[in-house]
Amino acid sequence: MKKVFILTLLGLAGLTLQAQNKKTVLRFPEVNGYQVLKGDFHQHTVFSDGSVWPTYRVEEAYVEDLDIIAISDHIEYIPKKADIPNTDFNRSYEIAKPIADRYGIILIPAVEITRRMPPGHFNAIGIKDANAFEQFVNKEDRSDTTGLTAALEEAHRQGAFVFWNHPPFQTPENKPTWFPIHEELKNKKLIQGVEVANGRYDKEVFQWALDYDWTIFSNTDVHTTITPRKAVDKGKTSLTLVLAKDRTEESVMEALRDRRTVALFQNVLYGRKEHVEPIVANSINAKMITLNGNYFLEVENLYHFPYEIEILGISEGYKIRNRTFTLNGGEAIGTTVTREKPKSEPVIALRLKLKNVYITPEQNLEIEVPVR
């Protein structure tokens, strides 16, 4: 009776989502011919150690306005096996795929390759057959690391993309630690990316991604519904932005291999300058309003992501009062400007620091915005 009750609740939750079809919208501008898609590449269901049915992951992704998800259930860790006897590790993807197609969500087949630390856990996304990874698992000790390299090599044989999950997990003092095995995997090019944020942000891991030319991820690793995680994060989103040529699985995988991603965690962006700068520059608009000899500067956020802004400077001949402010999505903030040196046709630019946009662990993005 208990099992039936739980599954019924999960089914009702899914029906509720379908009935409402209501989402929290988070939009970014197109940049340099790329669409900015929103993805979560690390999720679980009841087919490993999660607590929701695969279709719920898709319905929830729609409500959260995600474009891409990867259900990456464990091969090695299946605590619900007695209740959900399943020998096909592709099953969670197969169940979710028709619903994903219906909602317009890009669902990428994936698996989490799970070993004790070192070396830890790795996601292989874009796989062809999850069942092929079971042969590398020690049935007597499912966290045994001896088959790890072979499993990652199998992922690459299948054309998958491999990234390192939550590097601090199960390490001494819960800190990111670089072990000799990680150097070996890096040198063999078996790791292509890393989660700089998963429940928390780690600046050391962000630096690794920059140093080793890895793709940058921020994922939820959600096991239950997303609601408890959002409560911990105070409602702020954790996801990976993907700069894709178009809205297809092929374009997403191509973007991951070309490292065109940005991590979004608790309303902060972490990424390479060439990726975050055009997103910000195409989101912020500035104009000067003049009336009866008075000057009023208005800065507007054209999209949904909030920016913490510090005005570092304005063109010579002008002074500005309000220099630090939060610019929420769809909002505009105005401030008085004093003109010191009269010009017939003023050409003005703002120099801005984005205090919640990082291009290195210690450096915020700085841009120049023209004033119309």
Regions of interest found by a model, annotated:
Residues 47, 170-173:
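Short, small-residue-enriched loops and turns at beta-alpha junctions
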Residues 15-19:
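Sec/Tat signal peptide C-region and signal peptidase I cleavage site
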Residues 4-13:
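Sec-dependent N-terminal signal peptides
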Residues 8, 73-74, 198, 246:
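Residues that line or immediately flank small-molecule/substrate-binding pockets and catalytic motifs
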Residues 111-115, 168-171, 222-223:
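Short glycine-enriched loops at secondary-structure junctions
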Residues 2, 20-40, 58, 120-128, ...:
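Charged catalytic cores and adjacent phosphate/nucleic-acid-binding surfaces used
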Residues 160-163, 167, 177-182:
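His/acidic metal-ligating clusters that form di-metal
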Residues 23-161, 165, 200-208, 330:
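A metal-dependent hydrolase metal-coordination microenvironment
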